[in-house]
Design a protein with these regions (language model features):
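Bacterial N-terminal signal peptides that target proteins for export
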Residues: 2-15
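Sec/Tat signal peptide C-region and signal peptidase I cleavage site
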Residues: 23-29
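Extracytoplasmic "Venus flytrap"
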Residues: 35-52, 72-76, 222
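Contiguous mixed-secondary-structure segments that line small-molecule binding/active-site clefts
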Residues: 54-55, 91, 96-196, 227-230
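Alpha-to-beta junction loops
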Residues: 63-65, 81-95, 193-195, 209-217
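Short helix-initiation/N-cap motifs at beta->coil->alpha
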Residues: 69-83, 165, 180-183, 195-209
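Pocket-lining segment of extracytoplasmic ligand-binding domains
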Residues: 97, 183-185, 194-232
Length: 232
């Protein structure tokens, strides 16, 4: 089915749009309305980019193809969206690749290895042109019945903390760090930090109550979700 997938790297990330075979076949009708679900809120630039895509589709189809946008996890959250896509509950979805894809093919974790790829292009070429990458990507597409539509760059990932200035490895010890993906856990353990697994929708309250004080995320998310209030 459809995917709006985010490749997370510890230096940069980008996301791509996939849409379901079911959606493309249904679009053969004279008019069709599809549904796009994502966990990002309406202030997040990923949502704004997705809306630009939706507007372009509507224009290019002369109004025959309309996509309704459901942001902020109205339909599915960051961890639930794969189920919604696979079941056909939505036609397109915003999927964080390293959250959803390793459950389908564990070898997709190669996308999380810091420094392995020099650029977005090199990472994309691995999945599209190399034998092993094509094998991984083909398995994902076959099992989710989806196809790639576009890439949408997100930006760099940084570590933010409200506990103290992160001046070195010693400063990382005993931080209360949010973990989104499994690949983050070995890093935080090596630093001696306390680890708390949280969905995006749970981060604000966790920062507010002191459950966590540190997070890995793109700077744009800090602003979009008002996390900056606790990470100054």
């Amino acid at each position: 089915m459809s995917l709006l997938n985010t490749f997370i790297r510890y230096t940069k990330l980008s996301f791509l749009v996939l849409f379901s075979m079911c959606f493309s076949l249904s679009a053969l009708a004279a008019e069709f309305t599809g549904r796009l679900s994502m966990h990002w809120n309406d202030k997040h630039h990923c949502t704004k980019h997705a809306q630009m895509f939706v507007d372009e589709v509507f224009e290019k189809s002369n109004g025959r193809l309309k996509i309704e946008v459901f942001h902020s996890g109205q339909l599915f959250g960051i961890r639930e969206i794969m189920g919604g896509i696979t079941s056909g509950a939505v036609d397109l979805g915003g999927v964080v690749g390293v959250v959803g894809f390793p459950k389908i093919n564990k070898n997709f974790n190669v996308a999380t290895i810091p420094g392995l790829f020099d650029s977005f292009e090199q990472q994309r070429e691995f999945f599209q042109k190399s034998d092993k990458g094509q094998e991984i990507w083909g398995d994902l597409l076959n099992k989710t019945n989806s196809t790639l539509v576009m890439y949408n760059p997100v930006g760099p990932v940084m570590t933010f903390s409200g506990a103290r200035e992160l001046t070195g490895v010693d400063a990382m010890k005993d931080l209360k760090a949010r973990r989104l993906i499994g690949a983050e856990e070995p890093m935080w353990k090596a630093y001696g930090a306390k680890i708390v697994g949280l969905k995006t929708s749970e981060v604000y309250t966790a920062l507010q109550t002191g459950m966590i004080d540190t997070i890995n995320t793109p700077p744009q998310s800090i602003r979009a979700y008002s996390w900056w209030e606790f990470l100054k």
